[in-house]
Design a protein with these regions (language model features):
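Substrate-binding cleft of secreted/luminal carbohydrate-active enzymes
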Residues: 289, 294-339, 357
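Short acidic/His/Gly/Ser-rich catalytic and metal-binding motifs that mark active-site loops
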Residues: 131-139, 248-252, 329-334
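Glycoside hydrolase catalytic-domain groove-lining segments
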Residues: 212-293
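Active-site mouth of glycoside hydrolases
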Residues: 35-237
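Aromatic-rich peripheral "rim/lid" segments of glycoside hydrolase catalytic domains that contact
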Residues: 60, 323-400
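N-terminal export signals
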Residues: 5-25
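C-terminal segment of N-terminal export signals and the immediately downstream linker at the start
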Residues: 20-37
Length: 400
C-alpha cells in the first residue's frame, strides 16, 4: 500500500503556532551512562523501540507530565530495550521559521535525562511532518513548498537542528539525529534534489554532533522505486535504515503472515539495500518494523516477531527498533491499524510480543553481527514496487 494514499484519506494538516503551556523547569542534563558498552558499535546487535507515550501520545509535548513518561521508560527498560527513537512534532517545536520554543526544548532535555537515568539511548527524529497517519506541518511549510530546495526553508531547518544540537550535546546517551519520520511520505522531490539535501544535512549534523550517528529513516518506497532519495545514496550512508511492514510494503499480497514474504521481509530488504551498496559487508538498521496487520492476534504477532528477527539476524541485520512501545489510546482518532502495535498495552500490560522482544534482546544484544557470505544479487532492473517485489520473491525462492 502507498502510505501517501493512506495519509491523504486519514489525515488533516495540523499547522500553526502552538500556545505554550506552563513547563516544569528543565532537568539539568546530568552525565549519564550510555545504554551499554555496545555504544555505536554497528557490528554488535542492539534492540530498542520507537517510543509512543502511553498518556496523550506525542501530544504530550504540549501537555507535559513527567510522571507517566517515567513509568513508560521503566516499563520499556524492563523489556530489555537499550534505545528509543523519539518523535519531535515539528510545528510544536518550531512554529515560526526564526524561532524554536525553549519550553519544548526543555522538555526534550528532561526526556533525555530521564532516559539516561534508565540507561536508554536516544535517536532524535527531527522533521516529523507526518506520523501515524496525520500530517504535522509548520505554518511556514506546505507539502508543495520546496522543502529540499527553498533557501528560506533551509534556514529554518538549520536553525532547528542547531537548537536541538545545543540541547542534546551535554547528554552522553545520544545516538544522533534521524532526519525525519519517513520524509519521502511528506515531501517528494526529484532524486538529485533529495540526494543533494541529504548530503548537506549529513554535513550539518556531523558538524554539530560529530560523535553522533545520523540517519535518514525513509519508508520502503525509496528502496522499492525511484522516490525522493536514490537507493544508491541511501545505501552509501554510514548506517542505512529500513522500515519494514508486511502491510505497507504489500508483502501480505504474496502469502500469509508466517510465509517468507512477511517473516523474511527484514532479511530480504537488508539484501536489497546491500545490492545497491554493492557489498554484503555493510551494517543495516531495522529502524521500524512490525506487521501492521490489524487482524493478527497477539500470539500471531509474537510468532512473527520471533521468526522475523531470527531470519534478520541470519542475514546480518545489526540493530532493531520495534514499532512501537505502547498501544495508542482509543480516546484519540487514528486509523484502526495504529491502535494495537505496541509491545505494551496503553495501561502497561506486557503483551505476548513484548515477552518475545525481551527474550530476543536478552539472547542477542551485544552479540557480534555476522554478515552473509552468499553471493550478492544485482539490484532490481525494474525500479517499480512490482519489479522490486519480483526481485524479492526470486531471492526468497517463493512463488506466490
Amino acid at each position: 500500500m502507498n502510505r501517501r494514499k493512506f495519509l491523504a484519506v486519514s489525515s488533516a494538516a495540523v499547522a500553526g503556532a502552538v500556545a505554550e503551556s506552563s513547563a516544569e523547569a528543565a532537568l539539568a542534563p546530568a552525565q549519564t551512562n550510555s545504554a551499554s558498552s555496545i555504544g555505536l558499535d554497528l557490528m554488535r546487535h542492539r534492540f530498542g523501540v520507537n517510543y509512543t507515550p502511553s498518556r496523550n501520545w506525542w501530544f504530550c509535548w504540549n501537555d507535559w507530565d513527567t510522571g507517566p513518561i517515567r513509568r513508560d521508560l521503566d516499563a520499556i527498560a524492563a523489556l530489555g530495550a537499550d534505545h528509543l527513537r523519539l518523535m519531535l512534532i515539528w510545528p510544536f517545536f518550531q512554529p515560526n521559521p526564526k524561532w524554536v520554543s525553549q519550553a519544548h526544548l526543555d522538555r526534550l532535555a528532561q526526556l533525555l535525562a530521564m532516559m539516561g537515568e534508565r540507561h536508554l539511548d536516544a535517536l532524535v527524529t527531527v522533521f516529523t511532518g507526518q506520523l501515524s497517519g496525520w500530517y504535522f506541518l509548520p505554518s511556514f511549510n506546505r507539502l508543495s513548498d520546496g522543502f529540499y530546495i527553498d533557501t528560506a526553508m533551509r534556514s529554518a531547518q538549520e536553525l532547528f537542528v542547531r537548537e536541538l544540537a545545543r540541547v542534546m550535546k551535554p547528554h552522553d546517551n545520544i545516538i544522533g539525529f534521524d532526519f525525519g519520520n519517513e520524509l519521502d511520505t511528506c515531501w517528494s522531490a526529484p532524486l538529485p534534489q533529495g540526494d543533494a539535501w541529504m548530503a548537506e544535512m549529513f554535513k550539518l549534523m556531523n558538524q554539530l554532533l560529530p560523535d553522533g550517528l545520523h540517519v535518514n529513516g525513509v519508508d520502503h518506497h525509496p528502496w522499492f522505486e525511484s522516490d525522493t532519495f536514490s537507493a544508491q545514496a541511501l545505501a552509501a550512508a554510514r548506517f542505512p535504515v529500513m522500515h519494514c511492514y508486511p502491510h505497507w510494503t504489500g508483502a501480505d499480497k504474496y502469502g500469509g503472515a508466517m510465509d517468507p514474504p512477511s517473516v523474511k521481509l527484514l532479511a530480504a530488504m537488508a539484501t536489497l539495500i546491500r545490492s545497491f551498496a554493492g557489498t554484503q559487508g555493510i551494517p543495516v538498521w531495522a529502524g521500524e518494523f512490525n506487521t501492521c496487520l490489524k487482524d493478527l492476534p497477539e500470539k500471531g504477532q509474537a510468532e512473527w516477531l520471533e521468526k522475523a528477527v531470527h531470519a534478520a539476524i541470519e542475514q546480518g541485520v545489526s540493530w532493531f527498533s520495534y514499532w512501537d512501545s505502547h498501544d495508542v489510546d482509543h480516546k484519540f482518532q487514528f486509523d484502526p491499524v495504529e491502535y494495537s502495535l505496541g509491545l505494551l498495552t496503553n495501561d502497561g500490560r506486557v503483551k505476548e510480543q513484548g515477552r518475545v522482544f525481551q527474550q530476543l534482546a536478552a539472547a542477542y544484544r551485544g552479540k557480534r553481527v555476522n554478515f552473509p557470505t552468499a553471493s550478492l544479487p544485482s539490484p532490481p532492473s525494474d525500479r517499480t514496487v512490482n519489479g522490486t517485489w519480483q526481485w524479492i520473491l526470486t531471492w526468497l525462492e517463493w512463488k506466490a
